[in-house]
Every structure is written in structure tokens, then in C-alpha cells.
Amino acid sequence: MREALSPGDAERLARDAEPEFDTIVAAGGDGTVAAVANGIAAAPRPLAILPLGTANVLAAEIGVPRGAAGRATMIAEGPARQAWPGEIGGRLFLTSAGVGFDADVVAAVDPRLKRRGGRFAFVWAALGELWRFRPTSMTVIADGIGHRVGELIVTTGRLYAGGFAVAPQARLDEPVLHLALFEDRGRVGVLGRWAALLFGRSARAAGATFAVARKVEIAGPVGAPVQADGDIVAALPVTIEIAPRPIPLVRPNKM
């Protein structure tokens, strides 16, 4: 067992793990899991998840058992199947990335409140960003096809954020990105699409378009934040694409 005590530790510890360890277990949230995935990217070996974070989207995506015994069995005996990450500036993400209101909320989260209050920190940040909301516009080019949007969510699988299904047909073992593109419809539009997400009706959100792509180029307000797996990882302009190779992800036997 190795403990990550500061930013960058999880990636470094995974990268430097002794070769006799045939499986790397990431204990933490989606950001920690992504950091570990980046650490093993150059020489992939099976990655298992022990979900201890705020949202644990990837754990929900693959159906990690809730009980300790089930999790131990999965880590020890579960098959490692390929999962295709996304990539931003050479860094991998495993669940989702976002630009627009979504990323503004992540950027506004108070780390101290996140440690104490978990998901409440995101709710509080969302309320603040909604109050301060200013319409924005971005150009998104997905595999050569242009879109004009106010917000973009990119996922590798079905789920996003707190387990909301934005791409019900998506599979982690398919080398494509799933895009939810939302027109800029102001504060009311933000409320509408997030209400649709909460009630599992993202496909019916006003001004929503859905697509798949391997490469997405995004231009908009220079310096606007870009989030991936719940952490700010870049700023506009940015390119998001499918990673050049999959990682072996340990899953429950039922998967």
C-alpha cells in the first residue's frame, strides 16, 4: 500500500510501482483513478478501483460491488477488460470532460468544503455559478463537423457526474467519445438541461445535440476552464481525443 500525500503522488506511485505487482489498485475518487491511469499509461497493467471519492462515476459505470467482500473478490478475481480513455493534452481521463457551466462549477468548488461536505460542495458551487452566469459561445469541431454551443460534455461511457446517464448506449470498450452539445440558451437553458439530467431525460433537453467522435477541437473564451474526471486539467482552446491505446480495467465477473 502506498499513500498519495500531495498532488502528483498517485501518478508517480503508479508509474514507479514494482513490476511484481500485477494489478494496481486505485483507492479514491475519479480524479485519483485518472491519476493512477496516467501513471501506468506507458506500460499498462490491470487497474482496479476501490471507490472512496465524492462521485465515483467509473465505479458506478462498471458496477463495483458495494460490500467489502465483493470488492475484494473483484480485485482478486475479476477479469481485466479494455477501457478506452479520453485524452486532453497528453493526459488521460476515464469518465468525462466538460467545458462551459460544468467546468465553471468544478473550478469554483472549495477544496475544504469538498473534503467536509462531499457532493454538497458541488451543489453550493453550482448555485454560485448560476447566480454569476454569463452566456458564452464556443465552436466545437467533432471529426470535422462544426457546432456552435454554450456547453459541451464529453464521456467515455454511459454515466456523467453523479451517475447521470447522458450516453445510454456508450461502452467503455469502444474507442469513441460521446458528446452532449448544448446550445447557449442562457440561465434558463442551464436550469432546463440540468433538470433533464437529474430526471434521466437528457435526450429531451432543449437545444441538445448528441454525437460520437474520436477527436474534438474546442475554441471559445481563451483561458476558460476545462474539467476532466472532476478536476480542472486545461483551458481553452483545447483538443479532446480518444487515447491511442486502452487500459486494462478490472471489472466484476458479471460484467
Predicted regions mapped to residue ranges:
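Catalytic core of DAGKc-family lipid kinases
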Residues: A4, A41-P46, L50-E151
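Gly/Ser/Thr-rich active-site loops/lids in small-molecule metabolic enzymes
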Residues: P111-A121, G162-G189
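Short acidic/glycine-rich loop or secondary-structure boundary segments that cap or lie
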Residues: D102-V105, R148-V149, Y160-G163, R187-V190
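ATP/NTP phosphate-donor binding region
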Residues: M1-I24, A34, A69-G70, I240, ...
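Short glycine/serine/threonine-rich phosphate/pyrophosphate-binding segments
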Residues: A10, G31-V36, V57, A83
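Glycine-rich phosphate/pyrophosphate-binding beta-alpha loops
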Residues: G98, D102, I153-V166, I232
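ATP/nucleoside-binding phosphotransfer catalytic cores, i.e., glycine-rich phosphate-binding loops
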Residues: I141-H147, R171, L181-M255
